């Protein structure tokens, strides 16, 4: 989260009103820009669960934003299957507590991304 303030979801859908120095404002700006420019679906994804209260708050914020903008979320943070892995799998799939290895992306995350994207599109 890089210590960027979380911010709050606004009532506006006007790009000029978003505080892009906050997580909420930056996400809302991206969604608004994509809607105005390309008029295509927007999909965000969350990281698999790790020990971070600030990231947990950001995931909650993203769900608030989802309600406002009707975007899609591939939510690994709250995905029991993704987060319920053995220590052996954790060593194979993660470089550290946050960043997946190549195997982590390919074997652990990719099947979830494929399934959700098929549901969405």
Annotated model-derived regions:
Residues 1-21:
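Oxyanion-hole/transition-state-stabilizing segment in secreted/luminal serine hydrolases
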Residues 1-5, 27-61:
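Active-site segments of SGNH/GDSL-like serine hydrolases
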Residues 5, 49-121:
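Catalytic His-Asp segment of secreted/periplasmic serine-dependent ester chemistry enzymes
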Residues 9-11, 39-43, 88:
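A short alpha-helix capping/helix-coil boundary motif
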Residues 13, 28, 91:
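Residue-level detector of functional hotspots within protein domains
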Residues 15, 19-22, 54, 104-105:
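Conserved acidic
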Residues 21-28, 32, 110-114, 118:
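Amphipathic, non-transmembrane alpha-helical secondary structure
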């Amino acid at each position: 989260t890089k210590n960027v303030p979380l911010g709050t979801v606004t009532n506006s859908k006007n790009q000029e009103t978003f505080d892009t120095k906050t997580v909420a404002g930056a996400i809302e700006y991206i969604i608004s820009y994509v809607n105005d420019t390309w008029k295509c679906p927007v999909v965000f994804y969350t990281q698999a669960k790790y020990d971070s209260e600030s990231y947990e708050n950001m995931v909650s914020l993203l769900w608030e934003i989802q309600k406002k903008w009707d975007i899609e979320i591939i939510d690994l943070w709250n995905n029991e299957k993704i987060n319920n892995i053995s220590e052996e799998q954790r060593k194979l799939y993660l470089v550290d507590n946050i960043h997946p290895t190549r195997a982590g992306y390919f074997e652990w995350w990719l099947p979830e991304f494929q399934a959700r994207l098929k549901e969405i599109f």
